[in-house]
Curated annotation (Swiss-Prot):
Positions glycosylated per UniProt: N176, N273
Cytoplasmic side: 441-464, 511-530, 574-938, 988-1002, 1063-1070, 1121-1130
Alpha- repeat ranges per the UniProt record: 461-501, 1010-1041
Protein name: Sodium/potassium/calcium exchanger 1
Modified residues (Phosphoserine): S625
MF terms (GO), sorted A to Z: calcium, potassium:sodium antiporter activity; symporter activity
Reactions mediated catalytically: Ca(2+)(out) + K(+)(out) + 4 Na(+)(in) = Ca(2+)(in) + K(+)(in) + 4 Na(+)(out)
UniProt feature, compositional bias: Polar residues: 125-136, 286-295, 661-675
Biased composition (Basic and acidic residues): 170-187, 730-751, 833-855
Modification after translation, per record: The uncleaved signal sequence is required for efficient membrane targeting and proper membrane integration and topology.
NCBIfam families: 2A1904 (TIGR00927), calcium/sodium antiporter (TIGR00367)
Length: 1130
């Protein structure tokens, strides 16, 4: 059907090429219209309005540093340092007035009150001063030193801000005092009106002349928008919609002040009343300060100002790398006239408009003092200055603090989003999840498959490298965006949340939705979990100092290289481990199922099979070592699932075509285990702890129907074998053989009961006895004969396949009994087995039976037992064949009845296998089709996915088409570009949603983004688990986490360090470290619980893990919001 549909699709495409060309033009035209509309809507948007609303309760704070020693105009005194105030990610503006005999403290606050009044409280001497805080929220800050002044050292503390206070010493030396936390209570600023921000003035008084210089640099910080300021080209002051707040501390009473104004600035002129003060006393913003406060309230508006002379004393320099605002310097001087608070002045009209944006931090840098000529007027000059930028301003040992996330402006303000428009962002974020899954499954993973084929990479290594990258590409790009664009820990949160989602949610869901108890293959899970525990331990140790150095990133990458190397030699390592486990007493579970297989011939056949594997898509087999869903043919893409399966969990198959392909795959798997080389499935067939799922026999439409019937067959065989064992003990004359056989059968029964898997236990015993008593080739032959019986084919057929007999099959019951007798007798003696093997190649089955009767055993009772056993097995086999016949399975049951020669059977089966594999390959490799579906529901889904699929179909060649296979490099690069775009949209809209709701990007990454990027794997894992292959889903979920931890995290960190001169990457977060520790504990719980349940997962354990995931989410969110404190301190 797939071929017909595909041919029909090609014909339809040939019939209507013009429509597709027109659709491409329409699509491009639509994109142009949308882009122009977006630009048009964005123009009238006024960012300051949003900023004023957001920051109405959060005034900006500026860090101020005073003049250096050589620029001081004060004799016998040191420059005081202003302590920075920390409030909501902004620095408080404080200034110091330096005088010959006294330093007046002037706190000027700009409020909308119409009258302008001056309040002069009496001077009071204080011995302690604590930085003021206006808010309860805290944020860490790192203020680099100024180039021209003495360096001051700031220590960055995760989760808590520290404010550095400086105590001046004689001779101009600066002392670094102990940090003061911003939690200390002090004077509280009156919150300024909407959009408050401050500039820091400095006034130096010389002989009744005041020299004040202002230089303001506005830099961006988190969650602020740009502001537009209007300024005069000649001598106009900054014009913004915000107010100015000035705080100056002094020990003198002042009657006049100098105010730098917003808009048309009103400059007030006054004369100082100087009181006596001990000479050399320097007031300062240090814990010991003599202070007096004077508050001047003015009203914003156009106020005339007299503009005379100018001077420059100070400037503000921005050390940050990303600044888009020029510094604004205001130089002013007071006059000598005694005037009230208000003074007549001339009107200044702004003639130029400058747009500035607020950054996180502003640092005042001292400028050379300029000799000033006394002037009776006040001069205010506004001129821009280009700030210095780049990481060179930072000390080499400290990382550069990131500015605000680099996202484009949103069409909707925060208020609009809170009124309901955030629904669009949520829908867009969910839609991008689907888009990422489609890009990865339909284009990126097939391109990686072509690359692995071109490079001749083995399946295990490809599954651990390229295919893991295909499945984890969204997490990798999210981590890159978090480091370089959003400047947050969203990437770490996404990867940690995705890891917990895969460990707990995916595995628990697989256990809940599987039809039977989920039996796990122990080696892939044990191997991957061991590496994962090692990687997580390294990550926890590296997180302890809240910085990731370049060599730590390199160590994580080397851990991934070690994992790839292990996957390269996976089979050899697996065999060595199981050899060590097999040296235990015989009474224990035999861990060495197929260790006798790898002979020289088997190795040669294995190499041939490896070359064959590179040409075919990997078949997802139970017990496979690679255990990757991304390189398996059962992995269904989201696009096909949504269009071809409306209820994937209900019927456990995407469609009728998929059902047929899966039934054919089940037959191929059973035939492959019997016919392929012994070493091909060697790691897959290690029965010691390799547990085969035992589904209910009445499960329909599932590829586990064959094992369901095998269960009945094997139970019947075991009952018959035990009865045969008793008969042998009574009648056989060879006592030693009887004793060995009885002990072996008893051990077999115990092992089977322990593992609750009759098929694997029987295979173990047969292989172990064959290993101990026969040569390696005979052990392979016998083991394969046993395996054939377990895969739903009768032992007669299996014996014929392995030993190449040409015999005419008689009655099925008698034939099975005789073949079972051969199988048992072969295991009872080396000489007997070898002679039987030589004669069986030439004789019919009857002659073989006569031969065994002449081997010295008492045959009558034994023959009766074996005949009865054969009847029991025949009944079970008849039922199994009937079930398979009803479901369309024609593997071993049909070939038992009518074929006359084994060679013809093998040829037919090989042809069927090749045809099935070709059909599966063609079906799996079917390119993306834009064919219009039939049903209404599928048409709606088709239209829903069309905005994603159509641009991809236009821009990326599909390598699943033979003619486009040569363009795999373009597909690879194009897929990466699309994944990066979709990941950027996902993180941006998640940031907008989090900003609207009020949660951080780290929490969004832990919860929403982690689940969204992992849902495609969840759907595939559940579907595969319902088909009886849940162990692959579990192993793949752990294996994909290794790629995230060892590649998704360190690659962006290493790139950041290389770009920024090997600086470490700050990764501190409130609850992220504790979340990683929780992930580690959850992993240990999952592994120990699974191991204690003998590598089986029932629904109760799955439900417990399901609940643990939500417990992890709640704890992580509470840790991130500091509702609870992390018991593990960093």
């Amino acid at each position: 059907m797939g071929k017909l549909i595909r041919m029909g699709t090609q014909e339809r495409r040939l019939l209507r090429p013009k429509r597709l060309h027109w659709s491409r033009l329409l699509f491009l035209l639509g994109m142009l219209i949308i882009g122009s509309t977006y630009q048009h809507l964005r123009r009238p948007q006024n960012p300051p309005s949003m900023w004023t609303k957001v920051s109405s309760q959060q005034p900006i704070k500026l860090a101020v540093r005073d003049l250096p020693n050589n620029e001081m105009a004060v004799a016998g005194s040191d420059p005081p340092e202003a302590s920075s105030e920390v409030e909501d990610g902004m620095l408080a503006a404080q200034d110091t007035v330096i005088m010959d005999e006294a330093a007046p403290s002037i706190a000027m606050e700009d409020t909308p009150n119409p009258p302008r009044t001056t309040k002069i409280p009496p001077a009071s001497l204080k011995n302690s001063y604590s930085p003021t805080t206006a808010g309860t929220r805290r944020q860490k800050e790192n203020i680099p030193p100024t180039p021209s002044g003495a360096p001051s050292h700031f220590i960055s503390t995760p989760g808590r801000q520290r404010v550095k206070s400086y105590i001046p010493k004689p001779r101009g030396e600066r002392k670094n005092s102990s940090p003061t936390h911003a939690r200390e209570k002090g004077r509280t600023h009156t919150p300024s009106p909407a959009g408050a921000h401050t500039i820091s003035p400095t006034a130096t008084v010389r002989d009744r002349e005041t020299m004040a210089t202002y230089r303001l640099l506005e830099t961006r910080f988190e969650r602020t928008a740009g502001e537009t300021t209007a300024a005069s080209l000649k001598r106009m002051v900054l014009n913004t919609p915000t107010f100015l707040t000035h705080e100056v501390e002094t020990n003198l009473m002042t009657s006049s002040s100098l105010v730098g104004k917003n808009t048309a600035v009103s400059l007030r002129k006054g004369e100082r009343n100087i009181s006596t003060t001990p000479q050399g006393a320097v007031p300062q913003h240090t814990p010991a300060t003599s202070e007096e406060q004077m508050t001047v309230s003015t009203r914003m508006g156009s106020i005339p100002a007299t503009i005379e002379g100018s001077t420059a004393a100070r400037r503000i320099n921005n050390p940050l790398s990303r600044t888009s605002a020029p510094a604004i310097r205001i130089a002013s001087a007071t006059n000598r006239e005694k005037r009230p608070s208000t003074a007549p002045s001339t009107l200044v009209t702004p003639k130029a408009t400058m747009s500035t944006q607020v950054h996180r931090c502003v640092v005042v840098e001292p400028a050379p003092a300029v000799p000033m000529t006394p002037s009776p007027g006040v001069t205010s000059i506004l001129f821009p200055e280009t700030p210095s930028s780049g990481p060179s301003a930072l000390p080499p040992g400290w990382p550069n603090l990131h500015p605000k996330a680099e996202y484009p402006p949103d069409l909707f303000s925060v208020e609009d989003r809170r009124q309901g428009w955030v629904v669009l962002h949520i829908f867009g974020m969910m839609y991008v999840f689907v888009a990422l899954a489609i890009v990865c499954d339909e284009y990126f993973v097939p391109a990686l498959g072509v690359i692995t084929h071109k490079l001749q990479i083995s399946e295990d290594v490809a599954g651990a490298t390229f295919m893991a990258a295909g499945g984890s590409a969204p997490e990798l790009f999210t981590s890159l965006i978090g480091v370089f664009i959003s400047h947050s820990n969203v990437g770490i949160g996404t990867i940690v949340g995705s890891a917990v989602f895969n460990i707990l949610f995916v595995i628990g869901t697989c256990a809940l939705f599987s039809r039977e108890i989920l039996n796990l293959t122990w080696w892939p899970l044990f191997r991957d979990v061991s590496f994962y525990i090692l990687d997580l331990s390294m990550l926890i140790v590296f997180f302890l100092d809240s910085f990731i150095a370049w060599w730590e990133s390199l160590l994580l990458l080397l851990a991934y290289a070690l994992y790839v190397f292990t996957m390269k030699w996976n089979k050899q390592i697996e065999l060595w481990v199981k050899e060590q486990l097999s040296r235990r007493p015989v009474a224990k579970v035999m861990a060495l199922g197929d260790l006798s297989k790898p002979s020289e011939d088997a190795v040669e056949e294995n190499e041939q099979q490896d070359s064959k594997k590179l040409k075919l898509p990997s078949v997802l087999t139970r017990g496979s070592s690679s255990a990757s869903l991304h390189n398996s043919i059962i992995r269904n893409t989201i696009y096909h699932l949504m269009l071809h399966s409306l209820d994937p969990l209900g019927e456990a198959r995407p469609s009728k075509d998929k059902q047929e392909s899966l039934n054919q795959e089940a037959r191929v798997l059973s035939q492959t285990k019997a016919e392929s080389s012994p070493d091909e499935d060697e790691p897959a067939e290690l029965p010691a702890v390799t547990v085969t799922p035992a589904p209910a026999p009445d499960a329909k439409g599932d590829q586990e129907d064959d094992p369901g019937c095998q269960e009945d067959v094997d139970e019947a065989e075991r009952r018959g074998e035990m009865t045969g064992e008793e008969g042998e003990k009574e009648t056989e004359t060879e006592g030693k053989k009887d004793e060995q056989e009885g002990e072996t059968e008893a051990e077999r029964k115990e092992d089977e009961q322990e593992e609750e898997t009759e098929a694997e236990g029987k295979e173990q015993e047969g292989e172990t006895e064959a290993e101990g008593k026969e040569d390696e080739q005979e052990g392979e032959t016998e083991a394969e004969g046993k395996k054939d019986e377990q895969e739903g084919e009768t032992e007669a057929e299996g014996k014929e396949e392995q030993e190449g007999e040409t015999e005419a099959e008689g009655k099925e019951d008698e034939q099975e009994g005789e073949t079972e007798a051969e199988g048992k007798e072969e295991q009872e003696g080396e000489t007997e087995a070898e002679s039987k093997e030589v004669e069986q190649e030439r004789e019919t089955e009857a002659e073989g039976k006569d031969k065994h009767e002449g081997q010295g055993e008492t045959q009558p009772d034994d023959t009766e037992v074996k005949d009865g056993e054969g009847e029991t097995e025949a009944n079970a086999e008849d039922q199994c064949e009937a079930t398979q016949g009803e479901k369309g399975a024609d593997g071993g049951g049909e070939s038992d009845g009518g074929d006359s020669e084994e060679e013809e059977d093998e040829e037919d089966e090989e042809e069927e296998e090749e045809e099935d594999e070709e059909e599966e390959e063609e079906e799996n490799e079917e390119p993306l089709s834009l064919e219009w579906p039939d049903s209404r529901q599928k048409q709606a889904i088709y239209l829903f996915l069309l905005p994603i699929v159509f641009p991809l179909w236009l821009t990326i060649p599909d390598v699943r088409r033979q003619e486009s296979r040569k363009f795999f490099v373009i597909t690879f690069l194009g897929s990466i570009i699309w994944i990066a775009m979709f990941s950027y949209l996902m993180v941006w809209w998640a940031h907008q949603v989090g900003e609207t709701i009020g949660i951080s990007e780290e929490i969004m990454g832990l919860t929403i983004l982690a689940a969204g990027t992992s849902i495609p794997d969840l759907i595939t894992s559940v579907i595969v688990a319902r088909k009886g292959l849940g162990d692959m889903a579990v192993s793949s979920s752990v294996g994909s986490n290794i790629f995230d931890i060892t590649v998704g995290l360190p690659v962006p960190w290493l790139l950041f360090s290389l770009i920024n001169a090997l600086q470490p990457v700050p990764v501190s977060s409130n609850g992220l470290f504790c979340a990683i520790v929780l992930l580690f504990l959850m992993l240990l719980f999952v592994i120990f619980s699974i191991a204690s349940c003998k590598w089986r997962m029932n629904k109760i354990l799955g439900f417990t893990m399901f609940l643990l995931y939500f417990v992890f989410l709640v704890i992580s969110v509470m840790l991130e919001d500091r509702i609870i404190s992390c018991p593990v301190s960093v």
